[in-house]
């Protein structure tokens, strides 16, 4: 990267985009973020934004070179490095990712006939999107590269995930764009490190990166589903202890202990979506997605097993806390929260269910479930 080029643009500064912007600003870059939500932008401008994502409010209050705009032309013209971080949800009914917002952004860039820029897609896309659709949508942009650079982060720990990643995945449009992206991430690495030790970057084709992103997440979902399956087997086997069994399995260096714990089914905005998306993509290229279909089935089956176990306890009141989609997550994300789905099934079975959680999470639950449960706000 041209070491004198210090400006970076981010199109879409939602939860992930804002965290990226803050880390880039802390690494020494001048960052301009774009969004369409005027009120949200104003809170960022006056640094009054309240975020449940750890460290965001603190880093925002200390930032000096982060600005935001709702002027699309301004953010595009601000730099030659344009990151795009917009939602690509699964479109429902086991269909593919909804690339509508991303498509619209690329269409707008093409209508401006941008040139001499690097466009970097951060949001998750289906394999083949970059070169089959993305490049077509930017066909009028001269000397402009299209790159894929998905983040491997966890909601509720995004800043830490960006500052201390297991790896940086770069699906480079050209060697030059790959080098510039590597330079940018190395500056982020230096925020918490004095040398290059531990800096792991994987540069490859966009197609390889698209598959890698899904493959990593889906390996984790399979490991979680397998762990719960083994745990359920132990529960049905007198004399066995699921925690001892899983701990021993994790000692094998070929397997490792991460994500090898008994608990609730996996949920959230990414894991279920990516598992289904990889299965759907497999079918389009003629490979039967046996593993991903089985993982999804095991995950749902485990939820049903746990529900029956709770139901058989026949409690007077069923109390649940920590209702976000994963354990110890203070961010109000309840999408496909297994614990919440079990609570709903218990309530539907006529059981009294009390939800104890923080106000922000309870407010989110009430939006979807109303008075299905009784609630108690806790710290």
Q: Predicted segment positions?
A:
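Structural/interface elements that position substrates and couple domains in central-metabolism enzymes
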Residues: 2-379
């Amino acid at each position: 990267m041209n070491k004198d080029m210090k400006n970076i643009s981010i199109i879409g500064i939602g939860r992930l985009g804002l965290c990226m912007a803050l880390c880039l600003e802390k690494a020494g870059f001048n960052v301009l973020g774009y969004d369409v939500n005027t009120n949200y932008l104003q809170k960022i401008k006056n640094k009054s934004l309240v975020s449940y994502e750890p460290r965001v409010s603190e880093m925002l209050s200390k930032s000096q070179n982060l600005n935001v705009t709702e002027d699309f032309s301004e953010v595009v013209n601000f730099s030659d490095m344009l990151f795009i971080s917009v939602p690509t949800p699964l479109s429902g009914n086991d269909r593919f990712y909804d690339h509508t917002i991303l498509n619209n952004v690329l269409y707008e860039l093409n209508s401006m006939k941008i040139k001499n820029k690097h466009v970097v897609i951060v949001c998750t896309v289906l394999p083949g999107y970059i070169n089959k659709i993305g490049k077509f949508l930017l066909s009028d942009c001269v000397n402009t590269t299209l790159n894929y650079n998905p983040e491997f982060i966890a909601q509720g720990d995004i800043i830490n995930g960006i500052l201390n990643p297991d790896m940086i995945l770069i699906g480079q449009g050209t060697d030059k764009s790959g080098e510039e992206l590597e330079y940018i991430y190395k500056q982020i690495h230096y925020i918490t490190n004095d040398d290059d030790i531990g800096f792991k970057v994987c540069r490859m084709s966009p197609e390889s990166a698209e598959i890698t992103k899904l493959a990593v997440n889906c390996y984790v979902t399979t490991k979680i589903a397998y762990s719960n399956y083994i745990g359920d087997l132990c529960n049905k086997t007198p004399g066995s202890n699921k925690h001892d069994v899983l701990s021993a399995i994790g000692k094998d260096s070929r397997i490792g202990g991460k994500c090898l714990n008994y608990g609730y089914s996996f949920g959230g905005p990414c894991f279920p979506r990516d598992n289904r998306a990889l299965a759907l993509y497999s079918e389009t290229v003629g490979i039967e997605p046996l593993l991903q279909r089985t993982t999804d089935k095991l995950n749902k089956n485990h939820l049903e097993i746990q529900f029956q176990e709770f139901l058989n306890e026949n409690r007077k009141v069923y109390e649940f806390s920590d209702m976000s989609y994963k354990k110890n997550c203070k961010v109000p994300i309840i999408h496909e929260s297994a614990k919440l789905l079990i609570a709903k099934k218990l309530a539907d079975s006529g059981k009294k269910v009390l939800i104890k959680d923080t106000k922000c999470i309870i407010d989110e639950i009430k939006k979807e479930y109303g008075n299905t449960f009784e609630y108690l706000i806790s710290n």
